[in-house]
Amino acid sequence: MRLQGRKIAILVESDFYEPEIYYYQHRFAEEGAEAHFLSRLWGQPSIEFKGHELRAPLRCDESFEGIGDENLGQFAAVIVPSGMVSDRLRYTDDVEKLPPATEFMRRVFARPDIVKGIICHGMWLLAPTPELVRGRRVVVHNNLFGDVKNMGGIYVDADVVVDGDLVTGRAGTVFHLFARKIIDMLAGDTA
């Protein structure tokens, strides 16, 4: 088990892609890592989210909003998954302020010791903070090509792209390749 005792945070909301989320639950555990599903809980102790394809439930009882900078380092990686998760998480009551999930990712990006994983439409979450992507090599779903260009990212036509501490994946259907790259990086395997 190459990731024994490590923690991986996965942001979640309704309309998640079930095969991807279930794969992370099991695959990271196989390597000894704990998968922690984080969301905005809106003052509730937990929320049950529904998947996109099967409407399968996923209960979340951990919020990224309560994680201070001193506790951010408990996570070896933070993943923004595919589906509509990022679109739902980028909602904010006050349009003059960053959405809480985007603010969380801004703090994650300030930590080079944390691997950042963004797959498919997950890049939407960073749209309000283009400086996090500007000049970095990334891949996204074809629908987000224009968004990445507008953010100043360097689009690479590949299924998975690594740029330092940032791993990006083209589409939710390549979650296995995306997860493998994150596992290899966390295990120190650079091949």
For the regions a language model picked out, list residue spans one by one.
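Extended, subdomain-level signal for the structured scaffold at the beginning of enzyme domains
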Residues: 1-113, 124-134, 145-191
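A short beta-strand/loop micro-motif in the catalytic core of glycosyltransferases
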Residues: 116-117, 138
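Short, thiol/selenol-centered motifs that function as redox-active sites or metal-ligating centers
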Residues: 118-122
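Substrate-gating cap/lid alpha-helix
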Residues: 140-143
